Amino acid sequence: MSSKEQNTPDEQVSQESEMEQGQQAEAAPETVDVVDPRDERIAELEAALSQAQQREHDSVLRAKAEMENVRRRSEQDVEKAHKFALERFAGELLPVIDNLERALDMSDKANAELASTIEGIELTLKSLLDAVRKFGLDVVGDTHVPFNPEVHQAMTMLESDEHEPNQVMMVMQKGYTLNGRLIRPAMVAVSKAKS
C-alpha cells in the first residue's frame, strides 16, 4: 500500500468531519436567510427616492395649477379693466344726459320758433345715447315693471288701483348700467295696495 492509500484512524475522522462541515455549509444558506446590511440600505434609499419623486411630482402639479390660476385671474382682471374702464367717464356723462332730457321736458313744444331748437336737442340727446350704448351703457327707466332693488331706488310708495303692488309707477330719475354693472339706480315711485 502506498502512503496515500493508508489513512490512520485520526486522519479518517478529520476527513469525515471536514466533509460534514462542507455539507453543512452548503445546506446552511438554504435554511437561514442572511440579510446583507447593504441590501437593507438600498431598499431604504429606493423608498426615500420614490417618496422624493412623488413629492416633486406633487409640487410640480401644484405649481402648474397655481400658474394657471394666476393666468386666469390676470385675464379676468384685464377683461374687467377693458369692460369697466369707461365707468367714471360714463358717470360724468349722466348729468349731461339728464340736463338734455330736462331741457326737452321743459321746452314749449307748441312754440313754432323753438321747434328747430327742440329738434336739435332731441337729435343731440339721441346721438349721445346711441354713442354710449355702443360701449355698454344701458338705461334703466321702464315703468310698469316689478321693483328690483338691484337697479331701482324707491323714493316713495303710492297707493294705486291701476298697478299691482311693488310695481314701478313713475321714474323720477333714470338709472344706468354699464355692461350689467349698476352705475346709478333709477329713482322710482313704487305702488302699494290700498289699505
From Swiss-Prot:
Entry's Gene Ontology molecular function annotations: adenyl-nucleotide exchange factor activity; protein homodimerization activity; protein-folding chaperone binding; unfolded protein binding
Q: Which UniProt keywords apply?
A: Chaperone, Cytoplasm, Stress response
A Pfam family this chain is assigned to: GrpE
Note the superkingdom of the native organism: Bacteria
**GO terms classed as biological process:** protein folding
Q: Which InterPro entries match?
A: GrpE, GrpE_coiled_coil, GrpE_head
* Record localization: Cytoplasm
UniProt entry tagged with the keyword Chaperone: yes
Query: Which residue ranges does the record annotate as region Disordered?
Result: 1-40
Q: Name one GO cellular component term.
A: cytosol
Composition skew (Polar residues), residue ranges: 1-24
CDD domains recorded: GrpE (cd00446)
Q: Which family does it belong to?
A: Belongs to the GrpE family.
Q: What does this protein do?
A: Participates actively in the response to hyperosmotic and heat shock by preventing the aggregation of stress-denatured proteins, in association with DnaK and GrpE. It is the nucleotide exchange factor for DnaK and may function as a thermosensor. Unfolded proteins bind initially to DnaJ; upon interaction with the DnaJ-bound protein, DnaK hydrolyzes its bound ATP, resulting in the formation of a stable complex. GrpE releases ADP from DnaK; ATP binding to DnaK triggers the release of the substrate protein, thus completing the reaction cycle.
Fill in the subunit field for this protein: Homodimer.
- How is this protein named in the record? Protein GrpE
Species for this entry: Sodalis glossinidius (strain morsitans)
